[in-house]
Amino acid sequence: IVEWRKTGKPGLVGIVTGTIAGLATITPASGSVGPLGAIIIGASAGLVCYYACSIVKEAMGIDDSLDVAAVHGVGGVLGTLMVAFIGVEGTFGGLGLSVKNTLDDGTEVIYTSGEQFVVQAQGCLAAIALSVVATYLIVKIISPFLGGIRVSEEEETKGLDQSGHGENGYTLN
């Protein structure tokens, strides 16, 4: 829908990417939101991930093949953070509501959405840090066997979506 509004027509790449963004974004919240929460998260995913693709490609000048970071990374973080605010009552705070949990020793603990947001954000940062370190190590280990990880200048000019996958991704103007 966002691509349609921006370009004046719907495109297959936009439909598929929006669908994947919605799925990537609802995944961290899937056991914690109801149908309305899923719709809110899916709509947010389409909007936020579309603009994340634009920022990665245009503002940062990064050709992210198939927009993986902008769709899966940004979508995953968005879904994880939104759980704190729209998770169903009794799980992670719900719609700004407090959640009362009783610990094994009988102590009652009340969590608010703000507190849960901090926990969710810490989880995102830990996952991002783990991903960065693991990716760095994997690249360092396999790079000598592949002769490096850079594509040729011709492939880079052509674009990674086209040269690596034979498809054109977003053309953002």
Language-model segments: which ranges?
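Glycine- and aromatic-enriched membrane alpha-helices
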Residues: I1-N173
